[in-house]
Amino acid sequence: MNYCYECGHKLVMKELEHEGRIPFCTSCRQFRFPIFSTAISMVTLNPKRDKLLMIQQYGKPNNILVAGYVNKEESAEDALVREMQEEIGRKVLQYRFLKSEYFPKTNTLIFNFAVIIDSESLED
């Protein structure tokens, strides 16, 4: 990030206690921390935990995990419940956080969860 996302002024590096050198806008007089998207992905299991559900998205040939972006003012946990309902119409019975990972190509921090849904199959 080279320019302030509020005013467009060129940022300079400035020392911030306990943080190190952080981009700073001399016009707004504010530190500018990185901005990135936040998403969730889910390893989705049936109640018996012996089947893994993956989806096929928008005509792409490979199956993927159920995933989606976290909306503004939404928690990752609320997003996973919403995305599961939107993507496959199922309710989440349980979930457990697994790990997070940053993807530079899409500037996205993804929170990965294991999820148990309310059905043995999508046909129920």
Kindly label every feature range from the protein language model:
Residues 34, 62, 104-107:
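Short glycine/serine/proline-enriched coil/turn segments at secondary-structure junctions
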Residues 93, 101-124:
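Active-site-adjacent beta-strand/loop module that shapes the phosphate/pyrophosphate-binding cleft
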Residues 1-42:
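Acidic, metal-coordinating catalytic segment for phosphate/diphosphate chemistry
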Residues 43-87:
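Conserved Nudix-box catalytic region and its N-terminal flanking loop in Nudix hydrolases
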Residues 14-15, 91-100:
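A short coil-to-beta-strand element that immediately follows conserved catalytic motifs
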Residues 24, 64, 112:
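Conserved beta-strand segments that form the floor/walls of ligand-binding pockets within enzyme
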Residues 17, 46, 69, 101-102:
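Structured beta->alpha junctions
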